[in-house]
Structure formats: C-alpha cells, structure tokens
C-alpha cells in the first residue's frame, strides 16, 4: 500500500523546512570546523551501525549493565536532531538531557563532553545538520532492572557529572593545554581508559590507568614505564595514534582500531603531538604487571618450536598448534613474526599477546580487527563463526604461551561468556549493583512505612485530644 499521502506530505514539508533553516543559518566555515571536531570526538564510531547510513544511530554499545543503542544524530526531524534548538543540543551533549527532558544513559560520554566549549559543541551541531537526513528509529535498549529505569541515571549524574568548561592552565604550554582538552574533553579518552569507581563513574584518582570498552581491555596510558606508556618514545606514541601500529610494541584492535580508523588518523600532526605532550605528563599509575606488555616473547623461533602443541579445550580435537598453522600462519608467519612491512603484525613483543588478561586475544580471534582503512594496516578476519569455544580457548592459550605472557590462561567457559558479551567480573558487578538497588528500595519502602505509621499515630493522637477536649 505504501506510506499514506498525508504522512509523506508532512514529512516532506518538515524536511524542506529543516533544509531552509540550515541554508540560512550555517556558514561554511562553521561546518568545516564542525567536521574536524566531529572526527576528533569520533561521533561516527558510536552513532553509525550501517556504514551506508552514517550518523543514523542504532549502534549497540555494550555496558556493564546491558546494551544501549545509540541515537540518530542526522537532521531527520522525526528520528534525529532536526528539531533540536542550539540550546537543546548543547544540553544533550554536555548534560545528557534529551529534547523531551529525559536523561540520556551515560553510554554517551557527556561526563567528558561537559568540559567542551559551547562554541565547539555548536560547530559539531552545524556539521551534523549539514548531513543528509536519514529516518531511522533507535532500537530499544536491553537493560535489566533497575538499570532500565531512567531515574537511576539522575542518581548517577548527582555522583559523577562534572560541570564547567575546560580551563587552560596558564603555567603550561599551549600544546599541553590543547592535549589536555583533546584527551579529557573532546576525545573523551577516559571513557575507556579510566577505571570506574563504586558508582560506575570515572575514578579520577586512577585517571587513564586502564579500563574497558565492552569486553576489550583499554590499556593504561599513564606515564608509568611498566604498566603504561612511559617507556614509549614520542615518535612511537604519535605513530600509534595515527596508525594504530608500532612494531615491537603494539597493534590496535577492537574499539581502539576503530577509533584510529574513524578519528585519530584524521587529526592534524599538531593535535597528535599535543596529545602526546599531555600523556607524557599524566601521573604514573602502576599496575600488577611484572614487566611491560610489549616485552613478552622472544624473536620468532623455528617453525613448530613452541612446546605447546598439546593444548586443547572443550570439544575441539585440534590442538592450538594445529589451529594456528591452519588459520593464522599465512598472515602472521609460521613463527609469529608477521610480515616484513608490518601490515600483518608480529605476535611477539606485542601488547595484546603480552597482556595480563586474555580478553583482547580472545576478542581478536572472535571479532577480528577492522583496520583496512588505515594506511599500512590490514584487517583481520573474524573466526567467531568458525570456531567453537574450546577451539578459541586452545588457540588463545597457544598464542599467549608461545608468543606472549605464558601466565595467562583462558577456558572454554570464559570464551563462552565473552562471546555472549560478559565476563565473570562483570556478572558479579551487575549482581552487586542489583542487590544494592534492591536494598535501597527495601530501605526506602521501610522509611515510607515508618513515616506512614507515625502519621497515623499523629492523626490518632490528635483525634483523641479532640474527643477529650470535646467531652470537657
């Protein structure tokens, strides 16, 4: 039957009105500035689920409490931001409040964007409003109780939301201040790289000491020489931010690879160097690591000289060595050395294989790596649909034992949880939060009952006094 004519007409009128407003209000220079800032903030990374429909939302953002789906930020008047005024847009970005007054879930890092300047926020708005409008409603979030209640967000904001724009430190250089603004506000690095506190806000006492991005581990990027990036040169840090690859140290995967692809590779050299200058000065936050992640693994050994060929997990009959030879050696080499040009990474002296936890190795096997749009990088295929949990565990254990940190081990049960988007620690955290919320609800109910009882007693006492006075 198609769309009813009145619906088509009203929608067409709305789109025409939006286009007329944009043409008269948005100068080209503001749009150009907004394009750069939108890339720096990596808006497309979370607000695009289908590359052919940029900024239309629907991207699944895994959180410790369930899945949140991103909103449509195209100028569509019905499902996007076409009807948002400038003030409403700023309020959404910096305070996490929708146009209708509802609180936005902090999967959007408005606790970082709160420090952005209003001018930068409005420049981003100008760029977004200049994009083609796309009608695409947002899927419903998948959150268990009590996290599906938006009043919990209001409580979260009371504990964690910062106020006030970034204030430059006049005792520092212009580059340092620019880097601080990019890291702390616009680039919202802490959203992934800072651990969370008891209320699940960013733990400012351990700023940039390492956190999570979904199941992936976001590494410590403080100046600590073992746990962080203190032993990296400025050139290595700049190269990693621009390409996601520093042979002999690290290759970005997961959300970090996508951030390089969508955002960091497009930043100016001055801004990259400013980020490096600021990271150099972030106080060191030590971890539990015995040695730097990239220091594990020797030079590639002779083919088959691994001593771990017998590792198996679960129902799979193939050993880790069998799986590596059949699935990995074509790109990474029989001895894990990668390609000579670095486009296929070496697995020795690699921060992923040398990490203290197995999540990134497992997730790399399950999801692959999207890096093909970055110069000098190649994407890696995902094997999650090919291998069962036991085979993934066997391959991951083979890689860490032969090329990385031999103290790391993962089981088929661990892989099953990661594949489902969870970990044991995350499950415990959710149960603890639910128990806390249930306890708070019981306490609130008890207080209400006590108050009601006292009110009844007060009413009864007043009634008795009235009767007594009446009899007299």
Describe each region flagged by the PLM:
Residues 29-49, 54-62, 157, 167-197, ...:
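Sequence/structural segment immediately N-terminal to covalent heme-attachment motifs in c-type
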Residues 30, 42, 85, 116-120, ...:
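An acidic site on a long C-lobe helix of protein kinase domains
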Residues 56-61, 195-244:
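Active-site substrate-binding loop specific to GH73 endo-beta-N-acetylglucosaminidase modules
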């Amino acid at each position: 039957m198609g769309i009813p004519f009145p619906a088509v007409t009203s929608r067409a009128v709305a789109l025409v009105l939006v286009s007329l407003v944009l043409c008269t209000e948005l100068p080209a220079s503001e749009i150009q500035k907004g394009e750069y800032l939108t890339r720096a903030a990596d808006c497309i990374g979370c607000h695009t689920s289908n590359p052919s429909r940029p900024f239309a939302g629907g991207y699944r953002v895994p959180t410790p409490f369930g899945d949140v789906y991103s909103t449509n930020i195209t100028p569509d008047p019905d499902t996007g931001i076409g009807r948002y005024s400038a003030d409403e847009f700023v309020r959404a970005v910096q305070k996490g409040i929708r146009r209708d007054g509802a609180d936005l879930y902090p999967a959007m890092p408005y606790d970082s964007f709160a420090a952005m300047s209003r001018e930068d926020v409005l420049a981003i708005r100008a760029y977004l409003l200049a994009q083609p409008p796309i009608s695409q409603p947002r899927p419903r979030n998948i959150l268990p109780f009590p996290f599906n209640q938006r009043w919990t967000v209001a409580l979260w904001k009371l504990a964690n939301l910062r106020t006030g724009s970034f204030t430059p430190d006049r005792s520092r250089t212009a580059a340092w201040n620019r880097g601080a603004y990019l890291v702390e506000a616009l680039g919202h690095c802490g959203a992934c790289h800072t651990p969370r506190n008891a209320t699940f806000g960013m733990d400012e006492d351990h700023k940039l000491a390492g956190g999570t991005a979904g199941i992936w581990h976001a590494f410590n990027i403080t100046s600590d020489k073992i746990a962080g990036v203190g032993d990296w040169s400025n050139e290595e840090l700049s190269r990693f931010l621009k390409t996601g690859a520093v042979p002999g140290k690290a290759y970005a995967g997961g959300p970090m690879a996508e951030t390089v692809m969508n955002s960091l590779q497009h930043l100016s050299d001055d801004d990259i160097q400013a980020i490096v200058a600021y990271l150099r000065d972030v106080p060191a936050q030590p971890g539990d690591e015995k040695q730097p992640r990239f220091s594990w693994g020797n030079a590639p050994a002779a083919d088959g000289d691994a001593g771990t060929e017998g590792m198996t997990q679960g129902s799979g009959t193939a050993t880790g060595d069998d799986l590596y030879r059949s699935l990995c050696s074509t790109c990474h080499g029989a001895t894990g050395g990668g390609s000579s040009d670095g486009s296929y990474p070496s697995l020795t002296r690699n921060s992923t294989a040398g990490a203290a936890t197995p999540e990134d190795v497992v997730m790399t096997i399950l999801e692959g790596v999207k890096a093909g749009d970055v110069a000098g990088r190649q994407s890696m295929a995902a094997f999650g649909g090919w291998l069962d949990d036991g085979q993934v565990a066997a391959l991951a254990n083979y890689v860490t034992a032969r090329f990385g940190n031999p103290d790391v081990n993962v089981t088929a049960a661990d892989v099953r949880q990661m594949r489902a988007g969870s970990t044991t620690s995350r499950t415990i955290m959710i149960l603890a939060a639910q128990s806390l919320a249930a306890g708070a609800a019981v306490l609130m109910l008890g207080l209400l009952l006590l108050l009601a009882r006292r009110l009844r007693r007060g009413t009864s006492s007043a009634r008795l006094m009235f009767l007594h006075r009446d009899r007299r």
